[in-house]
């Protein structure tokens, strides 16, 4: 974890935003881009962009900017997206279905490789071509498929128990959609995607 702690989480969270924009530039055949152009389109201070990228190396040329293809390649390497990353999803409800189907649509190298649910009526059925398995098969499947990331979309009361099972199986990163706080060891990174809380904070700005 030491090498990761040198880079702030805020920087790491901005890298995928840069990557998404740069990937768009590739699609429209733009070959170079300046930090000013990136900042204007992403609403991020250009100096912050330069500082973020400089934390990982010297990727730009003064007066020219960044080579789009090269920067995409480097950011993907930094985020460890050059190889296939397998993800487990726990909770095959409406949200779990939506995430699985969207992931299949993306056709990216980060793919959902296993889906689990404790409802016997769902087990054996497929979502985006992936069979839903019982939670009793979670640890064995995660180990066998070498899955390191997981998504939790279960109800709040079940989230911590699921988190415990995932970390016991060797999961190193969890994206939690359950509207509750979960805890794991220091070697497990947890991110939250609480739609309700985000909407509530937006409501504050209503006039």
Curated annotation (Swiss-Prot):
Q: Show the GO MF annotations.
A: DNA binding; DNA-binding transcription factor activity
Keyword Magnesium assigned: no
The entry's cellular-component GO terms read: cytoplasm
Q: Does the keyword Transcription apply?
A: yes
What biological-process terms (Gene Ontology) are attached? Answer: negative regulation of DNA-templated transcription; response to redox state
Q: Superkingdom of the source?
A: Bacteria
Per UniProt, which keywords does this protein have?
Answer: Cytoplasm, DNA-binding, NAD, Repressor, Transcription, Transcription regulation
Locations listed in the record? Cytoplasm
Residues bound to NAD(+) are: 91-96
Q: Which InterPro entries match?
A: CoA-bd (IPR003781), NAD(P)-bd_dom_sf (IPR036291), Rex_DNA-bd_C_dom (IPR009718), Tscrpt_rep_Rex (IPR022876), WH-like_DNA-bd_sf (IPR036388), WH_DNA-bd_sf (IPR036390)
Q: How does it assemble?
A: Homodimer.
Q: What does this protein do?
A: Modulates transcription in response to changes in cellular NADH/NAD(+) redox state.
HAMAP family recorded: Rex (MF_01131)
Q: Which family does it belong to?
A: Belongs to the transcriptional regulatory Rex family.
Q: What is this protein called?
A: Redox-sensing transcriptional repressor Rex
Its source organism is Brevibacillus brevis (strain 47 / JCM 6285 / NBRC 100599)
Task: Identify the coding gene.
Answer: rex
């Amino acid at each position: 974890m030491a090498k990761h702690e040198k880079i702030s989480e805020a920087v790491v969270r901005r890298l995928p935003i840069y990557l998404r924009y740069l990937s768009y530039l590739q699609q429209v055949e733009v070959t170079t881009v300046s930090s000013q152009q990136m900042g204007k389109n992403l609403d991020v201070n250009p100096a912050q962009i330069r500082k973020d990228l400089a934390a990982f190396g010297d990727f730009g040329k003064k007066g020219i900017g960044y080579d789009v293809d090269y920067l995409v390649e480097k950011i993907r390497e930094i985020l460890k997206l050059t190889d296939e990353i397998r993800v487990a999803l726990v909770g095959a409800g409406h949200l779990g279905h939506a995430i699985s189907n969207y992931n299949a649509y993306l056709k990216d190298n980060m793919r959902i490789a296993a889906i689990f649910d404790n409802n016997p009526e769902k087990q054996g059925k497929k979502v985006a071509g992936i069979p839903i398995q019982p939670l009793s098969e979670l640890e064995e499947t995660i180990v066998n498929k070498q899955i390191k990331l997981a998504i939790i979309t279960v109800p709040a009361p079940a989230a911590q128990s699921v988190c415990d099972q995932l970390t016991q199986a060797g999961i190193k990163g969890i994206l939690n959609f359950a509207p509750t706080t979960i805890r794991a060891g220091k070697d497990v990174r947890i991110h939250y995607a609480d739609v309700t809380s985000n909407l509530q904070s937006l409501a504050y700005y209503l006039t």
